[in-house]
C-alpha cells in the first residue's frame, strides 16, 4: 500500500510582548506540530507542522494557533516537498 503523503509548512507567528515562553509551549502541544522555537526578527516564533492536507493545515492554523491568546498574526509558508535527512 502506498504511503499517504503529508503536507508540511512553516508558520511564522507574531505575538504580544512578554508572552514568548507561554505561547511557544501552547503551540508545541497542538496536533501536528513538530517543532516550535522562539526566534528574533519580524516574527517571534517559528513552527514546523505536518498535516494530512491543505484543509487540515488551514483548520489547525485558524482554530488552534490563531485563537491562542496573545497571537497577533501568522504567516504560513507551505513546503514544496518534504525531504528527510535520515535523522
Give names to the regions the model predicted:
Residues 1-87:
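A compositional/biophysical signature of low hydrophobicity enriched in polar/charged and small residues
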